[in-house]
Amino acid sequence: MSVKIRLARFGAKKRPFYRVVVADSRVARDGRFIELLGFYNPMLPKEHPSFLKVKVDRLKYWLSVGAQPTERISWFIKKGLISTEAA
């Protein structure tokens, strides 16, 4: 079983809203997930406090046990939008 940290799409047509989830890679994009880590709203400006919220401690846990982040989640981490540094 390959576990991925990825975005699951919600919201209305042309008004996307994403949940950051941990899911088995074989499950559909918006299907069953193991754990909800946070959310991402691309319709808001980056400075808005609700633009991207993630439970950092749980993200660190899943990365430590081998979960693979998708390209977009990796991009968030590299850009510093999700901090994985020790607090």
Curated annotation (Swiss-Prot):
InterPro entries the UniProt entry points to: Ribosomal_bS16, Ribosomal_bS16_CS, Ribosomal_bS16_dom_sf
Single GO biological process annotation from the record: translation
Gene Ontology cellular-component terms listed: cytoplasm; small ribosomal subunit
Entry keyword set: Ribonucleoprotein, Ribosomal protein
GO molecular function annotation: structural constituent of ribosome
Protein origin, superkingdom: Bacteria
Keyword RNA-binding carried by entry: no
Family: Belongs to the bacterial ribosomal protein bS16 family.
Name of the molecule in the record: Small ribosomal subunit protein bS16
Natural source organism: Ehrlichia ruminantium (strain Welgevonden)
